[in-house]
Amino acid sequence: MKQVLSMLFVLLLISGCSTDEQQGPANDQQPTIAEQENSPNGQETDGQEEKSVEVIAENLMVPWSIAKLGNTFYIAERPGNIVKIENGEFERQGVELEKELSTASEAGLLGFVLAPDFPESNVAYSYYSYEDSFGQFNRVVTLYLEDGVWREGNLLLDKIPSAPWHDGGRLKIGPDGKLYATTGDASNSAIAQDPNSLGGKILRMNLDGSIPSDNPFPNSYVFSYGHRNPQGIAWSTDDTLYTSEHGNNANDEVNEIEAGLNYGWPIIEGKEVQEGMVSPLFTPGDGATWAPSGMDYFDGKLYVAALRGSAVLEFDLETGDQREVISGLGRVRDVRIEDNVLYFISNNTDGRGVPQENEDKLYKVLLSEDDDS
């Protein structure tokens, strides 16, 4: 039976979340459109000039994914809503799903991406966690927007391993027109090395949910394996695929992904090296924790949302340098770059942050001053 999802989800997720980070109260306010505001907290590090941060929308409720078409934003909230933001107006749209949305700590309505023909079809793709009599799982589905409500349509992929932690969840359509999904190991590290499991993988599928004929393993959605909890995915202008991945306490990773390769977890992590396994392009090792989530690419650099790092991190693919571009705004869940502008969402209402007034928020910042877009 279809479920109309409730905002009570936030109270449930706070009671079920991990205790390794400070928890804060949930936000039950309606989203609002903020007046332009220059935040002194959004700043560059390493002596760089401060960036002017504009707040686009406030009172978001555990936002997880940013989708955008023209001047319209669609923000997926983990409790099971889509917030539409357009021309200074907002609307929190309900989502009706075929399965009961899980309220576990890191589960819920996660990845969300608009179909290429969305203006005509009103179709989007979503990754969500659910619970039934057989257990907890993740699935990839289409959502159809009608009369301000998103309804589950086609089931593309089901029974992706799920648990209170390590659900992965990012969805993106690649330059090849295929749908990619990041999946976590569901707190069972062994499945990341199991070629028959959908957990701990980067998955690749056609937009109708079928398996592409050129996937690296016959009759398999698996594109790469040996991942712990990847939550970010992006492509450079030469179509190179990159992902961001949560490490075990530390040892977070930014990886360059190639079809069919093994990225090591749980055999190696961070700076460790072993034949037949790929070590990351960037990692803090065991000395720091980023908790990286959504990511995007711009001008030779990767921009990564950091939850524990409480920043937007920039990784220069040519020089190997890395720095904080934005900091001081708390946990950051997702980023999106378009026309030289970086958009990002805070995630301080997820039960692990310390929410300030009117959080969470959608922000905007110009990446370079040679463009006034």
What name fits each language-model region?
Residues 2-10:
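Sec-dependent signal peptide recognition
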Residues 6, 45, 222:
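Residue-level marker of regulatory loop/turn positions in helix-turn-helix DNA-binding domains and
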Residues 10, 102, 162-163, 194, ...:
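N-terminal hydrophobic or amphipathic segments with adjacent small-residue motifs
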Residues 13-16:
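C-terminal motif of bacterial Sec signal peptides marking the signal peptidase cleavage site
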Residues 19-181, 290-322, 340-353, 358-370:
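Acidic, Gly/Ser/Thr-rich repeat motifs that build Ca2+-stabilized beta-propeller blades
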Residues 22-35, 107-109, 119, 186-324, ...:
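Beta-propeller domain segments
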Residues 169-170, 333-335:
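Short, surface-exposed beta-strand/loop micro-motifs that present aromatic residues
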